[in-house]
Amino acid sequence: MPIDCKAKCGNKAALKRPKTGDALCKDCFFAAFEAEIHHTIVSSRLFRRGEKVAVAASGGKDSTVLAHVMKLLNERHDYGLDLVLLSIDEGITGYRDDSLETVKQNRDDYQMPLKILSYEELYGWTMDRIVAQIGRSNNCTFCGVFRRQALDRGAKLLGVDSIATGHNADDIAETVLMNILRGDTARLRRCTNIRTGGGEDSIPRVKPLKYSYEKEIVMYAHYKRLVYFSTECVFAPNAYRGHARAFLKDLEKVRPSVIMDIIYSGEQLRFKDTAKKPVRGICERCGFVSSQQPCKACVLLEGLNRGLPKLGIGKKSKGDRMIAQQNQELALRERANLVKNDF
């Protein structure tokens, strides 16, 4: 027998919220979900009136719900924001080409300007070609580095004040686990931050969905009948994040609140002052923000162009040795050709 909505609106409950366990009707769920995101935006002071904000759009559930809710809240609460969609085409046949059609549908549905940038035009490579050269073991490293910089480049072209990404609570909890497993204290410091970047030379990124459960995002998209692309990236199954995700799901079965517990724990972590912090600067080659010289994107790109795809994988010293070895081999070949020509 259907039970009453916990919000006491007079309707029968249609669902149970994964985050709170409350039985709600659809309308009360929508209201609660949207109100929580509004509270996150306001309490964290993510935006200021008059700002231009790029919504990172992939066509997936997270970015589609983010675009929908951002437009809704911007109008409902009069944020005074100028919203645009920014999408990156990685060049993955059978995945990104199809999802971009969904992004274009979002553009039409929400009446937002759309800018699409491709790896091909930015780097001269597509992910299909990169994977053909390097295999599937490190493809997510290349894609992640290039995508982050591509968003920065697109944001700069659009002249926006910030980039809103669709990272949800599950994503952030997974990232905390990944950084703990890797012993990466530098990233562990900032992975729970709702705002990253910013400053004189970079455009800040914000996460309005930071406290929104992935299951609730799916429910919201389903009951709102939003159009989104649900196919997983064809190169994703081998990603390291998948192991953290599976571990998190197992923990969630035992303790339903584990996602928020991990996020709150990550927010409260303290590190010794002696712990090494990355120093952010400007890449001497591309001119974008980086914590190393040259930046990771430029190193990876150099490796691809040199035929040394593993150049940017691992420690910098390893990459330096690979370049030195290649230069030595080239010098030996040139010397051999000179000797041959003398005869």
From Swiss-Prot:
Keyword Transferase (UniProt): yes
UniProt-recorded Gene Ontology molecular function terms: nucleotidyltransferase activity; tRNA binding
Keywords associated with the record: Cytoplasm, RNA-binding, Transferase, tRNA processing, tRNA-binding
Entry keyword annotation includes Transferase: yes
EC number: 2.7.7.-
Pathway(s) per entry: tRNA modification; 5-methoxycarbonylmethyl-2-thiouridine-tRNA biosynthesis
PROSITE patterns the record matches: UPF0021 (PS01263)
Assigned protein family: Belongs to the TtcA family. CTU1/NCS6/ATPBD3 subfamily.
Summary of the function given for this chain in its UniProt record: Plays a central role in 2-thiolation of mcm(5)S(2)U at tRNA wobble positions of tRNA(Lys), tRNA(Glu) and tRNA(Gln). Directly binds tRNAs and probably acts by catalyzing adenylation of tRNAs, an intermediate required for 2-thiolation. It is unclear whether it acts as a sulfurtransferase that transfers sulfur from thiocarboxylated URM1 onto the uridine of tRNAs at wobble position.
Protein name per UniProt: Cytoplasmic tRNA 2-thiolation protein 1
Higher taxonomy: Eukaryota, Metazoa, Ecdysozoa, Arthropoda, Hexapoda
